[in-house]
């Protein structure tokens, strides 16, 4: 039996109850098992790092995923949705280092790599459990019992297998290249892991002396003076013009400088030169091969052995000096220039960011501390032209926030550059939401892609499965645990992490011993193999063939250069195709002013904070409806509260008929739609049609991954169609005591609409949907699906669709709104009836709407009658006013214009309008002369009669005739009395079926007579078995109150009838 529910939407109570219900009934597993054998839908969960509490961004991410998966499940899809966890890498290591008080890799080595690995594992697993609980609080359904975890050996084997494919396809290589380097973590980091922040650095202009020309210098500019000890060359653009300038300094010294011609004046101004003369010009091509002296060759002995010369490079820009200092060991472009020109790759900097012995004087110094020392040495030699500080964007390590450097180191690379064109072709086959995420943003990133550095010089990660012979230097890549055991004789149960796997050796064909290289994988390579590792590939090839590639993935827009990219790269290496079919790119969560949420700023909002205040479903519906998924979400507490009010309105709409249904023992199994179809009114047919339209709208939006449109369609339906319209139309029909078919028709319609609405909100607000379903369906039919999430998604019933009726009702609602506005103008409350409303329409459809929905309009406008004029015609009871138009009269009648205006003003407006119907008419002036005037010389306006209000709407004008009659006053005062008594019933907390005794004292005899005319009506409406109304009635009872009703004092007393 359907039960009544609480007055208020108590999200926390409902969600706790629903979670317990799901757990007790193993709901998630039941839903997944129920869809076995249906069309497969493979979802890969982009794995969050197990580093701590979830934040609003990760909450939004999982809510999007959960909503789409619930929708697909109800649409009969067999879903594979293992939750994913990224459990390796610096995100974990830095957290553990912080907990242990470590500051460098040396501390880890001292502590013991094995001990550190165990601490990382413990931390990752503990945080995984905590975060799982937080996601479950949001109502997120994934396979939490069998998640994929990158620390598991089966997952590690998928990564190993992938690297072996790279080797087999000649896509794996090792060598020295310049990479992003974190000197604190002492490891390479990916481009996607570099976070840019503003910082101040030296802006220095430095002179390099030409070897064979006295007092002649090429001028370079740099913000990294610490790289000068590593300088090998100077690059100029081959097509730029350069000037050889004779410059006079402040001390009147003369020197010759080489600078890009268009930059000469700016550079000399910065260098504080007094005057200059251009001696000659040449192209960058002419400068190629010019030899210069290293400015610090005496301090860095190895530099004295190297010939330094000017070379050409097309990437040089016409800013600063037009001459670029080249240090191949400290810049990606510099490295490429070095390789092209066969320069030595000189890199006298160690992994901790300190100079090595190769740096001579600077050995042991931290490079950033050395900036000042280098500049002083240059100054001492007269080679520092200028220095100042500038603020610019500079890269920092994503985890420890240390400023990165560029360092030439030995690394392992996947040859992504060779696959670039194939990758670009593959992404064209992927369905992107929004479209430009793939065709523009992702495409641009791939076009600029370089070979992927997959190695990291750390501990907690997937060990790179490369073994190298210490005798002959030959390499081998191991693809699986089985292969490793077979080739090494290692313990079959060996763990595949460091330091355990480091101890395993493999015999080499040369008779030597192969040892594993110490590097671990880039953590992005871990998650890159997720789509096949999730399927336990390579061990379960059949499952892989059934499910792969993924049908759907979604992550934030930063993942165009992160997970979307790494997956594509690894998949192209392994399989030669994209690993996903459909991608939704979503935005970031920001604070209300559009700033990134940050603990340091203090603007972070935790999901738990929102849930404690409003509940998980409100958070879910807010993040899903507030903006398009791909737009950044600016979190706003007021907007969140508005969404919560909308959910509360849904609750109240759902709650409204339940007491009446319970009182009447309404059983939808016994009252079929067919049994009441003949008794459906226009409003019933309309809401059923609107329900079908909303189903179609939600289907269209969800199929296009436009979750915001789906949510907004549902919210609009609940707010505008159900709460503000349909419930108002049918409310009196639910109060009828008799078991009549009209009331049963309303019950049946409401029931169907509520059950369908519950199914529509199930993907988005699963807790509220479940609560509604259990009461409406399971309380009636114990054989119905145990949970709403086992139900099929609503299907549009074309037989119920009536687009014409929907259009007419839209017009009717506009008329009602206009009528309300017109009432306000004459000060007449809606509670008071009016004798009629008149609609002056602009089209025939409006007339059809009025005629088709006359009873609805009369009821909602509280009018005794409704009339229409012909299309385009004014109401014939309107008055007409006329005024002369000086702008049209003056140019024609010149000095006589005043007399013409006076004559027009003295005439009857109706006569004028009639006379000018043909365009012009003749009028007489005061002096007896006649003149001809045109219609443009008179302005006409309509006036409404007294006690009539008017208001325009999009299809015409509504007039409300608010003249008072005896009957209207009687009904008006009676309705005022009824409202007061109903308020008093609520104050006494009476049930809808409780009867009362009432006594009403009215001091005004005229009003008393008016109210007495509706005595029986009042008694019926307030369920009064006894109702006494008079001048001197004794007003005692359980509750007595004095009221001022339209200026008339009244005292009302009521008591519950026992």
From Swiss-Prot:
Q: Where is this motif: 'HIGH' region?
A: 48-58
What InterPro entries does its record include? aa-tRNA-synth_I_CS, aa-tRNA-synth_Ia, Anticodon_Ile_ABEc, Ile-tRNA-ligase, Ile-tRNA-ligase_type2, M/V/L/I-tRNA-synth_anticd-bd, Rossmann-like_a/b/a_fold, tRNAsynth_Ia_anticodon-bd
Q: Does the keyword RNA-binding apply?
A: no
Q: Which PROSITE patterns does the annotation name?
A: AA_TRNA_LIGASE_I
Gene Ontology molecular function: aminoacyl-tRNA deacylase activity; ATP binding; isoleucine-tRNA ligase activity; tRNA binding; zinc ion binding
EC class: ligase
* Compartment(s): Cytoplasm
Motif: 'KMSKS' region; annotated at 596-600
Give the UniProt keywords, A-Z: Aminoacyl-tRNA synthetase, ATP-binding, Cytoplasm, Ligase, Metal-binding, Nucleotide-binding, Protein biosynthesis, Zinc
* Any single biological process term in GO: isoleucyl-tRNA aminoacylation
Which chemical reaction does it catalyze?
A: tRNA(Ile) + L-isoleucine + ATP = L-isoleucyl-tRNA(Ile) + AMP + diphosphate
Stated EC number for the protein is: 6.1.1.5
Q: Which cofactors does it use?
A: Zn(2+)
The entry's ATP-binding residues are: 599
Query: Hey, which family's this protein in?
Result: Belongs to the class-I aminoacyl-tRNA synthetase family. IleS type 2 subfamily.
Fetch the HAMAP family from UniProt: Ile_tRNA_synth_type2
Domain comment quoted from the record: IleRS has two distinct active sites: one for aminoacylation and one for editing. The misactivated valine is translocated from the active site to the editing site, which sterically excludes the correctly activated isoleucine. The single editing site contains two valyl binding pockets, one specific for each substrate (Val-AMP or Val-tRNA(Ile)).
Summary of subunit composition and partner proteins: Monomer.
Which PANTHER family does this UniProt record tie to the protein? Answer: ISOLEUCINE--TRNA LIGASE, CYTOPLASMIC, SOLEUCYL-TRNA SYNTHETASE
This chain belongs to which protein, by name? Isoleucine--tRNA ligase
């Amino acid at each position: 039996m359907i039960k009544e529910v609480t007055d208020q939407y108590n999200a926390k109570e409902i969600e706790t109850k629903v979670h317990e219900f799901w757990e007790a009934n193993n709901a998630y597993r039941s839903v997944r098992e129920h869809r076995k054998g249906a069309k497969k839908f493979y979802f890969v969960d982009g794995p969050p790092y197990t580093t701590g509490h979830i934040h609003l961004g990760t909450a939004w991410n999982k809510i999007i995923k959960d909503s789409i998966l619930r929708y697909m499940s109800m649409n009969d899809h067999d879903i594979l949705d293992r939750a994913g966890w990224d459990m390796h890498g610096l995100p974990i290591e830095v957290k553990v280092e912080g907990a242990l008080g470590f500051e460098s890799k040396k501390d880890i080595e001292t502590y013991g790599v094995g001990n550190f690995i165990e601490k990382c594992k413990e931390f990752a697993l503990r945080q995984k459990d905590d975060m799982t609980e937080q996601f479950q609080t949001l109502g997120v359904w994934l396979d939490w019992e069998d998640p994929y975890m990158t620390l598991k050996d089966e997952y590690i084997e998928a990564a190993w297998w992938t690297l072996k494919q790279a080797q087999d396809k000649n896509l794996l290589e090792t060598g020295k290249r310049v990479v992003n380097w974190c000197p604190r973590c002492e490891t390479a980091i990916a481009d996607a892991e570099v976070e840019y922040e503003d910082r101040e650095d030296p802006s220095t202009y430095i002179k390099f002396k030409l070897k064979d020309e006295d007092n002649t210098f090429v001028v370079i500019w740099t913000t990294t003076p610490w790289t000068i000890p590593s300088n090998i060359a100077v690059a100029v653009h081959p097509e730029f013009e350069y000037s050889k300038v004779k410059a006079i300094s402040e001390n009147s010294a003369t020197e010759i400088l080489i600078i890009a011609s268009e930059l000469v004046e700016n550079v000399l101004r910065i260098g504080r030169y007094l005057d200059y003369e251009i001696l000659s010009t040449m192209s960058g091509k002419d400068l190629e091969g010019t030899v210069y002296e290293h400015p610090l060759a005496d301090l860095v002995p190895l530099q004295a052995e190297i010939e330094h010369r000017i070379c050409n490079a097309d990437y040089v820009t016409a800013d600063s000096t037009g001459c670029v200092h080249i240090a191949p060991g400290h810049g990606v472009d510099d490295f490429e220039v070095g390789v092209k020109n066969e320069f030595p790759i000189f890199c006298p900097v160690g992994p901790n960011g300190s100079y090595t012995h190769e740096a001579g004087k600077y050995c042991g110094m931290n490079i950033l501390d050395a900036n000042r020392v280098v500049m002083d040495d240059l100054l001492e030699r007269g080679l520092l032209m200028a220095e100042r500080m500038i603020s610019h964007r500079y890269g920092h390590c994503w985890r420890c926030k240390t400023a990165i450097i560029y360092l030439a180191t030995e690394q392992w690379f996947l040859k992504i550059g060779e696959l670039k064109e194939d990758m670009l072709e593959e992404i064209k086959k992927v369905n992107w939401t929004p479209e430009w995420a793939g065709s523009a943003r992702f495409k641009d990133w791939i076009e600029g892609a370089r070979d992927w550095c997959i190695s990291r010089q750390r501990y907690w990660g997937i060990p790179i499965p490369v073994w190298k012979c210490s005798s002959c230097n030959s390499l081998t890549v191991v693809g699986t645990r089985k292969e490793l055991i077979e080739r090494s004789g290692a313990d079959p149960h060996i763990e595949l992490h460091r330091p355990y796997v480091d101890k395993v050796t493999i015999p080499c064909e040369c008779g030597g011993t192969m040892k594993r290289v110490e590097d671990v994988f880039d953590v992005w390579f871990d998650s890159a193999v997720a789509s096949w590792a999730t399927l336990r590939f390579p061990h379960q090839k059949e499952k892989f063939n059934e499910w792969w590639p993924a049908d759907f993935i979604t992550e934030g827009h930063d993942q165009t250069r992160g997970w979307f990219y790494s997956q594509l790269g690894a998949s192209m290496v392994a399989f030669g195709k994209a690993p996903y079919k459909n991608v939704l790119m979503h935005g970031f969560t920001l604070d209300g002013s559009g700033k990134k949420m940050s603990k340091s700023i203090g603007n972070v909002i935790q999901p738990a904070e929102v849930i404690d205040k409003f509940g998980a479903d409100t958070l879910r519906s807010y993040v899903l409806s507030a903006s398009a998924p791909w737009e950044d979400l600016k979190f706003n507490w007021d907007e969140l509260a508005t969404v919560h009010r909308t959910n509360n309105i849904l609750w109240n709409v759902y709650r409204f008929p339940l007491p009446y249904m319970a009182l009447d023992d309404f059983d939808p199994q016994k009252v079929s739609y067919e049994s009441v179809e003949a008794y459906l009114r226009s409003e019933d047919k309309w809401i059923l049609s609107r329900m079908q339209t909303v189903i179609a709208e939600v289907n269209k939006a969800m199929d296009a991954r436009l979750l915001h449109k789906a949510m907004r369609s549902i919210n609009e339906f609940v707010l505008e169609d159900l709460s503000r319209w349909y419930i108002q139309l049918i409310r009196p029909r639910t109060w009828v005591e008799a078991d009549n078919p009209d009331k049963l028709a309303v019950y049946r319609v409401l029931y169907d609409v509520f059950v369908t609405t519950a199914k529509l909100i199930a993907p988005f607000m699963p807790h509220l949907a479940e609560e509604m379903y259990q009461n409406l369906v399971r309380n009636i039919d114990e054989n119905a699906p145990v949970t709403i999430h086992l139900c099929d998604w609503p299907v549009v019933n074309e037989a119920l669709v009536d687009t014409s009726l929907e259009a007419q009702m839209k017009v009717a609602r506009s008329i009602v709104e206009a009528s309300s506005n017109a009432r306000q103008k004459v000060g007449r409350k809606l509670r008071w009836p009016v004798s009629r409303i008149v609609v002056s329409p602009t089209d025939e459809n409006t007339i059809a709407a009025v005629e088709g929905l006359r009873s609805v309009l009369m009821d909602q406008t509280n009018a005794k009658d409704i009339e229409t004029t012909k299309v385009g015609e004014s109401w014939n009871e309107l008055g007409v006013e006329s005024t002369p138009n000086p702008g049209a009269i003056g140019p024609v009648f010149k000095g006589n214009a005043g007399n013409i205006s006076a004559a027009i003003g003295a005439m009857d407006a109706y006569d004028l309008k009639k006379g000018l119907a043909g365009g012009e008419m003749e009028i007489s002036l005061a002096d007896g002369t006649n003149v001809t005037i045109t219609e443009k010389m008179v302005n006409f306006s309509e006036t409404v009669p007294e006690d009539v209000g008017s208001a325009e709407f999009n299809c015409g004008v509504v007039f409300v005739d608010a003249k008072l009659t005896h009957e209207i006053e009687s009904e008006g005062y009676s309705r005022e009395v009824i409202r007061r008594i109903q308020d008093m019933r609520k104050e006494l907390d009476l049930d809808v079926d409780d009867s009362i005794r009432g006594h009403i004292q009215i001091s005004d005899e005229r009003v008393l007579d008016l109210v007495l005319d509706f005595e029986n009506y009042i008694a019926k409406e307030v369920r009064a078995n006894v109702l006494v109304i008079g001048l001197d009635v004794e007003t005692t009872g359980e509750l007595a109150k004095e009221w001022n009703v339209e200026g008339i004092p009244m005292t009302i007393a009521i008591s519950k009838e026992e």
